Every structure is written in structure tokens, then in C-alpha cells.
């Protein structure tokens, strides 16, 4: 077991600035395993550079990587002609991968034989260690044991792992009451920019508010921790790279034994 886990998720084509944060964390914490949390594509201009880095880290540096919902959108477009990807960043990703835009049919053909596409669609959905569950969006206690599922799986568990937002954060969505973590393990996720998340606890414990008011183009997306007494924490980490160009990600370092957050690398 490594002494530390480095978690880096949701770069959305940020490229070198995000890569530099990951390398900075790796240099400071050499006794670590890096786990990438998905959503490497769409949004910014450098999807190919971002995916190449993740690919090389997995193939040659003992890192692990998860798929995110944007990788699933790409998969559904290529394999099932689902155009939803095209309103979520497909054009910038296709241009990054191939140097120019293509018709949908040609893009499908080119992606289907692309080694980085093949790499992405075969990534796992959940990674579990003795102390942690790493997942792109969220987990429920009854769906945290099957690590064989991939993007072609159509179960609710896979949907939840890739897409869940409020149904993961809250037990009472209307009143934004945080759910308990009943898994017995610390859960690390990305997917939702943390500045959009707020809530409170069911025991009177103070919660936290959103940093986005609906008016500003940029807003803070710090690490958020949800934790009830005598339960493991849930860490929310998405730095908002998909929509906030000045953000380069939250790269987090966790102690593998205590499951505590040690340090965050970002450009905030």
C-alpha cells in the first residue's frame, strides 16, 4: 500500500496547467499512487494532451484512472449515435484529437479506431481500497462492491457512479440535508463544481453555502468535506474547470492509512 493517494479529477481538457499540478504533487509525495477521477475531455482546448498524460501515467507509472460521465457521453455518441455529447463539448474534443473538426459520421469512425478512445471507454467506474472509495460522481452503500462495470453497463449503479449530484449529496433534497456515509470508507468524488454545492446536517451541525450567486463568471470551488460524527468523510473536489477557464483543478493528497486530506494543489 502506498503511503499517500493523489487524486486528480475533472480537468476537462485543461492540459499542461493541470498536468503541472499533478507532477508537483507527485514530486512532493513520491511514496504515492495517483488516481485520476474522470472527465479528461470537453470544455477546454487540450483534451488530447490531457488524455495522453493520463494514458502514460496508467501504462508506465502505476497510476489508476476512472471514467467520468463525459467519457460515457463520448462512448454513447460513437457506439450508439447519441448526440448529447455535442452539447457538452464534443467539438472541442474532436478538434483536439484530430487537429480539425469532422462530420459526425467521420468523427465516429475516427474515434472508434483511436487508441486513446479505446483506453477511455475501458476504464473502470469505481476503485476501492481498504480505506477509500474513489468514484467520479457518487456511491450508495448497496452499489460499492462491483468493480467490473464499464461504460457499456446500463444499470442504475453505473448511472449513479457517473452522474449523481443531489441524490448523492443529500438524504433530503428539498431541504438540502446532507446524507450519511454508511459505507464505512472515505469517499472521494468530483463531477459537480463545489461552488454550486451547499447544505446542512440533520444534527444541527453547521454546513456550508454556495460560492456561486448566479451573477459572476468565476467563483471559488474549494475542496468540500461532508462528515457526520463517527462516520468517514465524503470529499467533493471538482474545481470547475469545465466552465471556469482560470481554474486548473484541485489535486488532492490523502494519507492512505488515516484517510485524511493532507494537501491540495491548485492555482487558487
Regions found by a protein language model. Give the residues of each.
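Active-site neighborhood of phospho(di)ester-bond hydrolases with catalytic His/Asp-centered motifs
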Residues: 8-9, 34-38, 64-69, 135, ...
Amino acid at each position: 500500500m502506498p503511503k499517500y493517494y493523489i487524486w486528480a479529477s475533472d480537468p476537462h481538457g485543461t492540459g499542461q496547467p493541470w498536468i503541472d499540478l499533478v507532477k508537483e504533487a507527485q514530486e512532493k509525495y513520491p511514496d504515492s499512487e495517483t488516481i485520476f477521477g474522470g472527465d479528461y475531455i470537453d470544455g477546454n482546448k487540450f483534451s488530447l494532451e490531457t488524455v495522453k498524460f493520463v494514458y502514460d501515467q496508467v501504462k508506465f507509472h502505476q497510476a489508476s484512472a476512472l471514467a467520468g460521465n463525459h467519457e460515457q457521453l463520448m462512448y454513447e455518441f460513437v457506439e450508439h449515435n447519441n448526440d448529447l455529447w455535442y452539447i457538452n463539448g464534443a467539438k472541442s474534443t474532436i478538434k483536439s484529437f484530430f487537429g480539425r473538426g469532422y462530420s459526425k459520421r467521420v468523427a465516429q469512425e475516427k474515434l472508434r479506431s483511436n487508441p486513446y478512445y479505446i483506453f477511455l471507454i475501458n476504464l473502470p467506474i469505481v476503485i476501492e481500497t481498504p480505506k477509500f472509495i474513489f468514484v467520479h460522481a457518487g456511491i450508495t452503500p448497496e452499489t460499492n462492491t462491483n468493480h467490473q462495470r464499464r461504460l457499456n453497463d446500463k444499470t442504475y449503479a453505473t448511472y449513479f457512479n457517473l452522474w449523481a449530484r443531489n441524490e448523492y449529496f443529500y438524504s433530503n433534497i428539498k431541504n438540502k440535508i446532507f446524507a450519511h456515509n454508511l459505507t464505512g470508507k472515505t469517499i472521494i468524488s468530483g463531477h459537480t463544481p463545489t461552488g454550486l454545492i451547499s447544505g446542512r446536517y440533520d444534527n444541527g451541525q453547521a454546513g456550508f453555502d454556495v460560492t456561486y450567486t448566479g451573477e459572476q463568471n468565476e467563483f471559488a470551488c474549494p475542496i468540500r468535506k461532508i462528515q457526520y460524527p463517527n462516520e468517514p468523510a465524503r470529499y467533493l473536489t471538482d474545481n470547475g474547470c469545465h466552465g471556469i477557464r482560470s481554474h486548473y483543478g484541485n489535486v488532492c493528497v490523502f494519507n492512505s492509512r488515516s484517510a485524511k486530506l493532507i494537501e491540495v494543489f491548485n492555482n487558487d
